[in-house]
């Protein structure tokens, strides 16, 4: 059974790696988004569409089609096009290098938008049509406030992953089932992995272990609580915006959850037992014929808490579903996409828990050791939560302390009678020494006159408002600009700061542009104005602006990227 469990787990990881490899394969031709870089700006009462066309590629004039929703589209005048003998369509009018297209719109009503369809080719290869939907700024009706319309407000672009997912949902509802597969891939990310010890402790870590069918029911119930909460929170964020997400990540909420998980871990150590009131307990026992640890209601509630913990993590699939809800207002399809995404995130948890329930022994002293081990693992959740609000330099000490406590318990609790077990003990002592590195390094730094050189953090100009951003974009005319939207409670934002922005090659690449950062932690009025202007649905979000101060919407980043991934992204600018 153990062999089958590891075979299944290896297969899941292999599928994820194969998927990643497939997406990383570089095609012979540029992607459509790379060949035809689209951007738009709304200013001076007019909408400007712009395509930067790669060398050797071209756009068909006849395939550029515009349609307005809740607005009236004026006559569109194209610049002079080049006549070209196309091997597919005969003589056609095309555009090379770049195309700037002014568009006049009037009679803008509630939630106006413009849909743009275009198609291009290169020698020997033709692309399918691309579609972009742009939310329109009411200032296009004649409000000449330069400040209110000087910046683009669109995020829907052909090659932004979240936008492609949103468009796929709009064009084909069957693509919704792809979110289930995307969720499985997200299950192995830092936002979801902390859910495993909580579920495993509930199903495996109590006295009378359930049978396989009962373990499946409990784990499925847990995932349902997590998925439904994740879905409802996602729809709420799409409807209300970032303020709701900020509220969930406030210090009071995070500290409360951390205290709860610490108490649960203490109960796993046998310090006390968590029991419901007797009347509730009797009813739950009658329904489930299990002790309190296995009650379905309890497990569902813990799943809800897990959904709260996982909710702030922004990824391209999550952003795509939220973007679809925000643009279409279709709560049913958007909610189902969010549910399938969360369900996919929970499937590996179900499999690991059910197989672990079968593999681990169900009685004897080993059971108490397993329960204590899960208590240590559960203590990782408070650290995961508290690290969002503590300065980053405290986090290594928290993890080191937990690892030292766990290894110390493991060394003292195992029986070392054979030569093999003695070797294991030596390895554990070595691991104990390695995990003490943050504390040893702290002592060394306080007693040594020479500190080890560290990689400097990326220098960023701090801004606080949309008005200040406009001023900076004007000041940096002729230079590309990057804007990082950061919050203390955003885990992936801290990962960018720690792992990506400290990379020397990343810093060298960013040295050619102006790098700005705005702190969204407090969700001030200035934060809200900027967020609404750019239609930001979650963090982390990184925006890029060209030399003229227009956002390059096709390269907007949502979700964490490693240094290598970020460098590849920058090469597309």
UniProtKB/Swiss-Prot annotation:
Keywords: Cell inner membrane, Cell membrane, Cytochrome c-type biogenesis, Disulfide bond, Electron transport, Membrane, NAD, Oxidoreductase, Redox-active center, Signal, Transmembrane, Transmembrane helix, Transport. It is found in: Cell inner membrane. One of its GO terms (biological process) is cell redox homeostasis. It comes from the Bacteria. It is a multi-pass membrane protein. Residues 21-175, 249-251, 314-331, 387-393, 447-573 are periplasmic. Its EC number is 1.8.1.8. Residues 440-573 form the Thioredoxin domain. It catalyses: [protein]-dithiol + NAD(+) = [protein]-disulfide + NADH + H(+); [protein]-dithiol + NADP(+) = [protein]-disulfide + NADPH + H(+). One of its GO terms (cellular component) is plasma membrane. It is an enzyme of class 1 (oxidoreductase). Disulfide bonds join 121-126, 191-313, 490-493. Required to facilitate the formation of correct disulfide bonds in some periplasmic proteins and for the assembly of the periplasmic c-type cytochromes. Acts by transferring electrons from cytoplasmic thioredoxin to the periplasm. This transfer involves a cascade of disulfide bond formation and reduction steps. The keyword Membrane applies. The chain crosses the membrane at residues 176-196, 228-248, 252-272, 293-313, 332-352, 366-386, 394-414, 426-446. GO terms for molecular function: electron transfer activity; protein-disulfide reductase [NAD(P)H] activity. Residues 197-227, 273-292, 353-365, 415-425 are cytoplasmic. Gene3D superfamilies: Glutaredoxin, Thiol:disulfide interchange protein DsbD, N-terminal domain. Residues 1-20 form the signal peptide. This is Thiol:disulfide interchange protein DsbD. Belongs to the thioredoxin family. DsbD subfamily. CDD domains: DsbDgamma. Pfam families: DsbD_N (PF11412), DsbD_TM (PF02683), Thioredoxin_2 (PF13098).
